[in-house]
Amino acid sequence: MEALGFLKLEVNGPMVTVALSVALLALLKWYSTSAFSRLEKLGLRHPKPSPFIGNLMFFRQGFWESQMELRKLYGPLCGYYLGRRMFIVISEPDMIKQVLVENFSNFTNRMASGLEFKSVADSVLFLRDKRWEEVRGALMSAFSPEKLNEMTPLISQACDLLLAHLKRYAESGDAFDIQRCYRNYTTDVVASVAFGTPVDSQQAPEDPFVKHCKRFFEFCIPRPILVLLLSFPSIMVPLARILPNKNRDELNGFFNKLIRNVIALRDQQAAEERRRDFLQMVLDARHSASPVGVQDFDMVGDVFSSTRCKPNPSRQHQAGPMARPLTVDEIVGQAFIFLIAGYEIVTNTLSFATYLLATNPDCQEKLLREVDLFKEKHMVPEFCSLEEGLPYLDMVIAETLRMYPPAFRFTREAAQDCEVLGQRIPAGAVLEMAVGALHHDPEHWPSPETFNPERFTAEAQQQHRPFTYLPFGAGPRSCLGVRLGLLEVKLTLLHVLHKFQFQACPETQVPLQLESKSALGPKNGVYIKIVSR
């Protein structure tokens, strides 16, 4: 009996601890790899994942380089794991068409991590299902040619500050980082056009708006926290949402308060006194339901059509009242997306275009002649004259976006199990469109690393295979602000090249090193010299 008692104590003590530890380790080992059989079951090739973090280390060199490597090693349809989440990567045009257009009803939503800032989560970029459709429909009118024409003078005013700053570099003859100048300029445009708050980032870097913008784009998740989020998403993501975060809360509070104050001021003003900026266009549209259906949401298709500055007859219907008007949080969200697109996408597009023109002087000379002729006819450019009167500038921008698409990857989620061109797609799967790999595929773009604006003559574009050029996406959920983004890029290059010429110099990095943590951009800036004309 004493022996049995002794045995009982042993079982209840250290042996239980050891047994539980072994069971826990076995459970963790199973959990660490349990999500990593799904791609294989779908017949999709992929890099070998590491326990818990999946293929996170595959992307340590940057998403751009890794996207090219995925395409090279595993083909136009492959996959990877980021933590436990599975991604199906597509760079095959016909399948992309099926996802973005033909089967859009099953791929309506973008992937959301659950960690987005409140302002970002309430934007049209991340809204989902019916609410996305309602808000996108209401905002369509804010991007009409008529409304963009009203915003053109505001962009030109911000550009005047940029020109004054560039003049000092032209007078000094020094090499400088023009990307930093563009970043200050796009901050000024965003503040003025989207937030109704004119600033001068170059002269007033301590302005609260400028400081909070800088804080937002410097925000990043520490690597150990990122590993935990990827490894245990069902626990860590909800926890991260509810735990206090001073930086996040201060940024949300600042931009929310700023918009609320502007709304309160404008509600007290007569209609003719209100500033005609993007924020006002959103406020004007906040109660209006879309007069069109999802099938007419494709802004990118309109922009690249031959009638891009003419009214679309399908949209010439009177909008009715919106069942649930845009909330203040949603209005802040739209301004916030303007901030992200303006600060990153427009800045980087301008930087890349400047680099390509500086290193391709023959193309720059041709563009300068077009700019001079245009300026002779249009001293004060309007939206439609910019749309139709600068064909070579259009070609330069299009080729810049082919070579260096800032938005080089975007996602869709499968709502239900389906089959796309013979490939089974399970519900909840995240599909990633590999725009960078598509734009550098020699099958579609011969000599893809060569800058050649002639790829985008009217005749050449007729020969392009559909869905091989996607700098703004495609289909009903393509970029809503494509017109405004291109307007800002074109207007800026027009004003700058009318006054200055870009020159490569010993400090110019050739080829450019790239950074791709989020949007694609130059890693070390774009150093050039400029000469007054």
Swiss-Prot record:
Quaternary data: Monomer.
Topology feature Lumenal, residues: 32-75, 245-335
UniProt-annotated binding residues for heme: C479
Any one annotated GO CC term: endoplasmic reticulum membrane
GO molecular function, one term: 12-hydroxyheptadecatrienoic acid synthase activity
A Pfam family reported for this protein in Swiss-Prot or TrEMBL: p450
Protein's recorded name: Thromboxane-A synthase
Species this chain originates from: Macaca fascicularis (Crab-eating macaque)
